[in-house]
Amino acid sequence: MSNNPTFGVEEEFLLVDPRTGEPIARNKAVAETAAAKGVDLQLELTSCQVETATEVMDNSDDLRKALLRLRRVATDAAETNGARLLAAGLPPTVPHKFPITPTPRYRRIGHRFGMIAHEQGICGCHVHVEVPSRDAAIRVSNRLRPWLHLLLALTANSAIYRGSDSGYATFRSVLWARWPSAGPPPFFDSEAQYDATVAMLEDAGAALDDGMIYWDVRPSNKFPTVEVRVSDVPATVAETVLFATLVRAAVMTATEAEKNGEPVVPLTDYVLKAAYWKSARDGLDGRTIDLAESHAVAPTVELLTNFVEHLRPALEQLGEYDTVRGELARVIETGNGAMRQRRAFERRREAADVIDELAAATIAE
């Protein structure tokens, strides 16, 4: 039996009108069609979104196959119902507001949070990695903080928004940060402190319940996992697998460091926020802040390469080191979702070209 932690992935997708590219409220019909094909799609806050979830996985090859199948079934279900499925952090074109999915909980969120909720047609990717306890998940979260902005830059896939270049590689992360319980995870000294903070947010009305604790790392409230949710939904299956594998190795590395009593990298909230902003703006082909060592600004690809080396023992234990190095090099050379969006947009400065690019990438092998 392997000592490696199991993992799983959730991906959120947009449903858009095939003719106009605008988000289209078809999630219930699409989910019903997918269910007939054996795939359970979850309804998200807005009715132009669906979410897939893999089974519990123990290797990246099976994860790749599962993600591809889920994306293709969801794509077919969308087309059956007159919609197009996009793996994108934001729609390249967007209406004034997104219709809220009509469930009691989502209606309550829409009523309490107003325009924040009604502009919430954004899509991320969440990776769950097995941990021994809830307390372990919180301690792992503390140790992942210096690396999250690098994963954000790597997976950026929301550059084009409202028919123009947003100026950010991931504008999704900027919009997401408006929620009072979103963004980089705070540092917690204990499980008790975590619980007290969550209780305070709920008492203040900043979250309905612990399901609305949207920090980019959190202990799952459903599974024995730590959940890393910093990413835009990646454009391709290959990029999602790369992201998930890095997260799995990072959790393993953090767990080992905790066991060995290694010091946690001290980070103030404003430094972490600055690194997030820099990574969100510049993306993979820009520069960001080295939070692990110098706090100097350096090329993002250099810091990502250093990150992979930091994870090398865990990646080698998983048998993934060479694969991850090769896949990272490929993404650096060919571009991630944000870079592909911009290349498509620059051809004619038409959002339709971006949508075509995203739709093809969504189901590419």
Swiss-Prot record:
Record field: catalytic activity: L-cysteine + L-glutamate + ATP = gamma-L-glutamyl-L-cysteine + ADP + phosphate + H(+)
Family label: Belongs to the glutamate--cysteine ligase type 2 family. YbdK subfamily.
Function: ATP-dependent carboxylate-amine ligase which exhibits weak glutamate--cysteine ligase activity.
Biological process annotations from GO: modified amino acid biosynthetic process
Keyword Cell inner membrane: no
Keyword Cell cycle attached: no
GO MF annotations in UniProt: ATP binding; glutamate-cysteine ligase activity
Keywords carried by this UniProt record: ATP-binding, Ligase, Nucleotide-binding
Coiled coil spans: none
Superkingdom per UniProt: Bacteria
InterPro entries to which the protein is assigned, alphabetical: GCL_type2/YbdK_subfam, GCS2, Gln_synth/guanido_kin_cat_dom, YbdK
Descriptive protein name: Putative glutamate--cysteine ligase 2-3
EC number annotated for this UniProt entry: 6.3.2.2
